Amino acid sequence: ISSQVRHIDFMPTILDMLDIKINDSFEKLDGESLLPLLNGEHREEKFAFSETGNPLNKNAPPKIPNTKSIRNSKWKLIHNEYNDTMEFYDLENDPNEENNLIGKNLEEEKKFLDELLKYTNN
């Protein structure tokens, strides 16, 4: 698989490979099976969301504030809650994340911010 995948896709993939169906009364899994991708099919890339304890303040407990990010294979948006800063990177042209593009009025920035808010407001 050459496209970005998410760790939440592993369980649905394994269940799909083993032909194990999820009971409809169970809560829906967040991920999706990667089996179609393994079989050469194409699917639209999904956003990958991550959240980690606060790496910017070593004295703060690891609960909150956190650092949250959302990405696809081209772009990555990071929100540092500790100091309420944002970072936005073009991963294709800046894989080391050295050129923060936040506030450069890129159309993608708003799209990613909206997606991040969807994840964090659920």
Descriptions of predicted regions:
Residues D94:
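Intrinsically disordered, low-complexity polar regions and short flexible loop motifs
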Residues S3, I8-M11, D16-L91, E108, ...:
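C-terminal cap/loop subdomain of S1 sulfatases and analogous C-terminal strand-loop tails that border
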Residues E97-L101:
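Carboxylate-dense, calcium-coordinating segments in secreted/extracellular and ER-lumen proteins
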